[in-house]
Amino acid sequence: MLTERQELILKTIIMDFTQTHEPVGSKTVMNQLPIKVSSATIRNEMAVLEDQGLIEKTHSSSGRIPSSEGYRYYLDNLVEPLKLPESVYNTIGSQLDRPFHQVNEIVQEAARILSDLTNYTAFAEGPEKRDVKVTGFRIVPLSSRQVMAILVTSDGNVQNQVYALPHNIYGEEIEKAVHMINDQLVGKSLNEINVSLLSELAKSELGGEHVTELLSLVEDVLKDAASEQMYVDGQINLLNNTSEHNVKDIRSLYELIDHDNLFSNLMDSKADSKDKNYPIKVKLGSELPNDLLKNYSLLTAEYNVGSHGKGTIALLGPTNMPYSQMIGLLEYFRNELAKKLLDYYGKFQ
């Protein structure tokens, strides 16, 4: 554990470095410390911090920069959320205040707002759908071999997909199957409707000759409705932290975000943190499981929508980001997003 003075020096180095991105010397630290300390004493204390692996020297400067261990100590012991300018709060309020027609629209907008405010890559996952119920199901024929399945749930979401059917199924048979499906499924939560229930319905003669094909279609649309969709915005901002000459890394980063479930898993996992109950979790690049992310940090925040479940928002940015500002932003934003979703759900109660 560091002394109070050593902690102040480490905090000063990190806060200056995240603002200037330049190595920090003892004179800079002396001018910014809230206590009066000689330059010689600061140099001695910086040597102690360096010996402990919390700061390190670059080859091009006599100043020091934080190490991964230094950032981790700072995040676990010293960081304080910063109050943001009123204009930021006003922007969040005005952009979340517009009318939305589905939960997914709100969650997607959350990712866009966070990315715009930070110039980082933002992620957002909606609340769990554990208590969402089916309120209606329709199959609309588009041709003799093609239909659109439409599922409406109690949170106002409408899921629709187009399917090709293996047989000619006529309107009367579709209506018969839809009537049976609505009788059996409406009012049940997405979690209650499992494969065994659908199999039982398939054995029933109430749905007509092709009920099995239609129920497999229902199973697909139910899976999509129950799945947690992650929205990503600001992928272009990855270029700000990657060498423009390293085209291969840029392409790999894009593929990692667009096609891999890594971030969804990371957003669900708990970062190593001194306070396990702290609402904002931070994983440094050295703690992330892919070498492409070694110069990035992932900040995740959980938001709570009461009985409607919990969701997650996240930011992926450079390791030398201003953590106080970003943590302050995520703390405020998660509460505002939860309020917006509670207001939205209130319309359906």
Curated annotation (Swiss-Prot):
Any one biological process term the GO annotation gives:
negative regulation of DNA-templated transcription
Could you cite one Gene Ontology molecular function of this protein? DNA binding
Q: Which residue windows are transmembrane per the record? A: none
UniProt KW Transcription regulation keyword:
yes
Gene3D superfamilies per the record?
3.30.450.40, Heat-inducible transcription repressor hrca homolog, domain 3 (3.30.390.60), Winged helix-like DNA-binding domain superfamily/Winged helix DNA-binding domain (1.10.10.10)
* Keyword Lyase in annotation: no
Q: Which Pfam families match?
A: HrcA (PF01628), HrcA_DNA-bdg (PF03444)
Q: InterPro entries per the record?
A: GAF-like_dom_sf, HrcA, HrcA_C, WH-like_DNA-bd_sf, WH_DNA-bd_sf, WHTH_HrcA_DNA-bd, WHTH_transcript_rep_HrcA_IDD
**Keywords of this entry:** Repressor, Stress response, Transcription, Transcription regulation
What protein family is recorded? Belongs to the HrcA family.
Biological function: Negative regulator of class I heat shock genes (grpE-dnaK-dnaJ and groELS operons). Prevents heat-shock induction of these operons.
User: Per its record, how is this protein called by name?
Assistant: Heat-inducible transcription repressor HrcA
Organism this protein belongs to: Lactobacillus acidophilus (strain ATCC 700396 / NCK56 / N2 / NCFM)
Gene that this polypeptide is encoded by: hrcA
